[in-house]
A protein has these predicted regions:
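Phosphate-group recognition and catalysis centered on beta-loop-alpha active-site segments
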Residues: 1-181
Length: 181
């Protein structure tokens, strides 16, 4: 949800994901480079919603983005898709509002290293729900955001995933879905 106009149509109980990059020395919302977009500050000024997922689209702007989040008193957020050097350095300085990725392609061993260092794990579902009894123990040390299989054109898997999570007593804190409500 990269525009204030679209944000205003989202019920306050829901969070959103935004794509942040720089353009003409300003932080803007745009998925693709070299495109104009809404000013990040204007968006944050209008943000009164649930969890804000801040997808960093350009290395080097992370601290500038965090500064703006603090300025607008946004507390319920995490950074997504930041480069690993940022995760490494910032987590060792006490910054926890970022996420580490986990999927069938991204190792639980890396996730383990960030227990008590960061708050969030982003659980992607490229081709399947990648949870089992062993990795659930690790994942439960974090707040969890699950990518809904509808993001990968598999809406038919949603009910199966819910059933599996219930059977494994696995709960999540938020879901990234294709739907806006």
């Amino acid at each position: 949800i990269n525009t204030v106009k679209k944000l205003k149509s989202i019920p306050l109980k829901y969070g959103t994901e935004i794509d942040v990059r720089s353009y003409n020395n300003k932080l803007i919302l745009a998925h693709d480079p070299f495109k104009k977009g809404d000013n990040l500050n204007f968006y944050l000024k209008n943000y009164n919603h649930g969890t804000l997922i801040v997808n960093i689209k350009e290395a080097g702007i992370e601290y500038l983005v965090v500064k703006q989040l603090k300025k607008f008193k946004i507390k319920n957020y995490f950074l997504l898709d930041v480069e690993f050097p940022f995760i490494y350095k910032s987590s060792r300085k006490g910054f926890k509002n970022t996420s580490i990725r986990f999927s069938e392609e991204e190792s639980i061993d890396t996730v383990k290293k960030y227990i008590n260092r960061i708050n969030w794990v982003w659980i992607d579902t490229f081709s399947k729900l990648p949870i089992n009894k062993n990795n659930i123990k690790v994942l439960n040390k974090f707040k969890k955001c699950l990518v809904s299989p509808d993001r990968w054109n598999r809406p038919q898997d949603i009910k199966k995933y819910i059933k599996t999570m219930k059977q494994k007593n696995f709960s999540i804190d938020c879901v990234m879905t294709s739907k806006s409500t």
